[in-house]
């Protein structure tokens, strides 16, 4: 049996209480109005490409931008919105979702992250992103 570190334990605990989405499910939910929020770094996005229609929000300000009661919220942050977080591989997005859910936001993330998104043949593009720092 492989040793699981503390962060692995935390990750497992963080995923309790919501249903994670496949890339295809996330893409469908985005088309139906959910906010797809990309938390990858600039370097990761330069390597993998940008996700069409995704909002890019740095992990360090994520909660402030998405909390509808925050003075620093983005215009899309409204009560009842659904957020789908996505990162490179689907790990840090789960921790972000736990934090968002803890402040009352309906959030989930994408199993396998952008790597799975690309593997499933979903679109990425090169060029400008919708950054909300």
Could you describe each region identified by the protein language model?
Residues 85-86:
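Short, surface-exposed ligand- or partner-binding patches at beta-edge/loop junctions that are enriched
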């Amino acid at each position: 049996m492989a040793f699981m570190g503390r962060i692995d334990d935390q990750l497992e605990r963080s995923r309790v209480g919501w249903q994670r989405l496949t890339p295809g499910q996330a893409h469908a939910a985005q088309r139906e109005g959910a906010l797809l929020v990309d938390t990858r770094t600039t370097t990761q996005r330069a390597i993998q490409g940008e996700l069409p229609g995704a909002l890019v929000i740095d992990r360090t300000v994520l909660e402030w931008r998405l909390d509808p009661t925050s003075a620093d919220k983005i215009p899309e942050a409204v009560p009842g919105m659904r957020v789908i977080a996505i990162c490179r591989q689907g790990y840090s997005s789960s921790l972000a979702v736990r934090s968002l859910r803890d402040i009352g936001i309906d959030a989930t993330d994408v199993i396998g992250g952008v790597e799975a998104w690309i593997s499933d043949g979903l679109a990425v593009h090169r060029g400008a992103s919708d950054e909300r720092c």
